[in-house]
Amino acid sequence: MEYLTEIVGEKGYIKVEGDLDSEQSGEALRKAFNNVYDRGKRTIVLDLTQVQIINSYGIGKVLMCYKRLKAENGVLMVKPLGGFVKETFELLMLDKLLPVDNG
């Protein structure tokens, strides 16, 4: 499993496809994050629009990315969310923590 990464200007983008609910998907997110982070990007946008299910394991990996960026005065953003993922983010108040990238 591998997630697409892209650099556009000062932002790095990670497109997560499939569910974010296993060690395999979490490891793929970590690798994609490191790929963008190691290229000097401190504003990273997670595109979770294709994710149907996210569990505590996936949330933990998202928070790991957030904490690492915050330590460097960076920002972790998300594309506009929908469905179960949006409900989960709202329930955990992650929608207050992670700004939405509408670009």
Regions flagged by a language model, labelled:
Residues 2-31:
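STAS-typified acidic loop motif
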Residues 20-97:
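Amphipathic alpha-helical interaction surfaces in cytosolic regulatory modules
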Residues 99-103:
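Short acidic-hydrophobic, aromatic-tinged amphipathic segments that line or gate anion-handling sites
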